[in-house]
Amino acid sequence: IKTAADSNSRWRPVGLGVMGLQDAFFRLRYPFDSKEAQDLSKRIQEEIYFYALETSCELAEKYGPHTAFNDTRASDGMLQFDLWGVQPTDTARWNALKARIKTSGLRNSLLIAIAPTATIASIVGSYESIEPMVSTLFKRETLSGEFLQVNKYLIHELKQLGLWNDHI
C-alpha cells in the first residue's frame, strides 16, 4: 500500500525489544513483582533504549535523519523518559546523547516495541512479552496444532529436589 510505504520512508520506524525477561527472572530466582525484578527490568530497558538511540543517531550522522525528525519531540531534546517524568541512571551520559541527537538527528522515529510475539517466543523457547507467565502448564493452539507447554524452570527445580516423576 503506497500510503504505508510513504509513511515508513518518512518516519523509518523499527521495533527493538526485550525477549526472555521472565526467563531471566526465573534463572535469578526473582519473583516477577519484586524490587529486584523491577530494577533489572528498568536497567535492561534503559540500555536497549540508550543504544537504540545512539545507533540511530550514528546512522543519522552517516545518512541523514529521517525526513520527519524536525516534527518530533526528540528534535527538541525530549526523550521518552522526559515525557513520563522518569530519571535515567546516568544523566551525564544521557545529556551527551541528547545534545548529539539535537545536532545530528535520528535515522528512526520509533525504536522500542514490546516483544516478542507468542509465536517468536515459542520458536526461541522463551516466555512471551514482558508480562508474567500465565500458568505453569498450558496448551498453546497454533495453525500447526496444539502444544502442551510446561514451565521448564519448574521442571528443573522439581528435578533438583528429586520431586519430578511420571505422575507429575
Question: Residue locations for each model-derived region?
Answer:
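Long, C-terminal-biased catalytic regions of enzyme "large/alpha" subunits
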Residues: 1-168
